[in-house]
Amino acid sequence: MDETIADLRELCLNYIEQDERLSRQKLNFLGQREPRMVLIEGLKLLSRCIEIDSADKSGCIHNHDDKSVETILIDSGIVCPGLPLIIPDGYKLIDNSLILLECFVRSTPASFEKKFIEDTNKLACIKEDLAVAGITLVPIVDGRCDYDNSFMPEWVNFKFRDLLFKLLEYSSQDEKVFEESEYFRLCESLKTTVDKRSGMDSMKILKDARSFHNDEIMKMCHDGVNPNMSCDDVVFGINSFFGRFRRDLLNGKLKRNFQKVSPGGLIKEFSELYETLTDNDDILMLSKEPVESCPLMRFITAETHGHERGSDANTEYERLLSMLNKVKSLKLLNTRRRQLLNLDVLCPSSLIKQSISKGLEND
């Protein structure tokens, strides 16, 4: 539980944008310790991000003070009759036109249509009362099918909701911790949301905490490079440099300072560059390290000793097939059909490779 809350706090502090309109709700969220309150304040923070994002895109002012429509008009110096208590998510008063914004998130078409009709009717019920005061109502209902917003990356949004859902495990009230509708909406969003980002796209969003030497290396690599050169220009430049070098070498302007070397000698010299290191690594040890350091490679290439089967089935192929089936059974790649096909291709490729190697051994 503490680890889940710590992960939520880390996401809130590091990956949700610093906006003054979110500061109050972020403080309320970060100040909670009980799972029930962390869950409620986390959902409020997520809803606040969506409301502000919708207000910004609609050109409205976010109603962070939870003002009613009547209070908004009174603060603007407009006398109006008594109005039903309606607290919009956003508003904007332009001359005699009042823009009211309502936003919501629903994952299923049925609940989306129901909520859209409810919000539309709620705003329409005060249209005639506002007309008496000379105010023209402009209602805006912003309905969304997901929780994406501009204040956090998509993978942070998904992870944040997933961690909030995990907090239900530590509560005895389960979905009664908050409204039942909120519980089902959270379940639907986690069930229907498919992360659109691949692993590399998500890695690119992470903060770059590398040292300055990386920038210096990239600057040295790109310094003096002309990006406007075509492939023919590059080939022509290389050929001209090589022709000049060849001509000067044949004419005697350049001394022949070449010597024959062996690959083994080069590797030995390279391994002895750092005198402080006492490790004597050879090629055999270096080739074994990648296999031994990877549990997956150890599982595939392991040599088992025990009772041998009478069949000619290749054990290495069977281990590979078993491993791929286990990966597919996890249902992690259900939305990546091409990657699933790649896993299927690995099985016949491995079998063909083993058959060829076995045939060569028999010959």
From Swiss-Prot:
Residues that coordinate or bind Mn(2+) 2: 89
Residues reported to bind Mn(2+) 1: 51, 89, 102
Cofactor: Mn(2+); Mg(2+)
Gene Ontology BP annotations: viral genome replication
GO cellular component: host cell cytoplasm; virion component
Top-level taxon of origin: Viruses
Annotated TM spans: none
Reactions performed catalytically: RNA(n) + a ribonucleoside 5'-triphosphate = RNA(n+1) + diphosphate
Note on cofactor: For endonuclease activity. Binds 2 Mn(2+) ions in the active site. The divalent metal ions are crucial for catalytic activity. For polymerase activity.
Keyword annotations from UniProtKB, A to Z: Host cytoplasm, Hydrolase, Magnesium, Manganese, Metal-binding, Nucleotide-binding, Nucleotidyltransferase, RNA-directed RNA polymerase, Transferase, Viral RNA replication, Virion
Molecular function in Gene Ontology: hydrolase activity; metal ion binding; nucleotide binding; RNA-directed RNA polymerase activity
Localization (cell): Virion; Host cytoplasm
E.C. number: 2.7.7.48, 3.1.-.-
Entry comment, domain topic: The N-terminus contains the endonuclease activity (endoN). The central region contains the RdRp activity.
Self-association state and partner proteins as the record states: Homomultimer; the oligomeric structure is essential for the polymerase activity. Interacts with nucleoprotein N. Interacts with protein Z; this interaction inhibits viral transcription and replication, Z partially blocks the product exit tunnel for the releasing nascent RNA product.
Official protein name in the record: RNA-directed RNA polymerase L
Species classification: Viruses, Riboviria, Orthornavirae, Negarnaviricota, Polyploviricotina
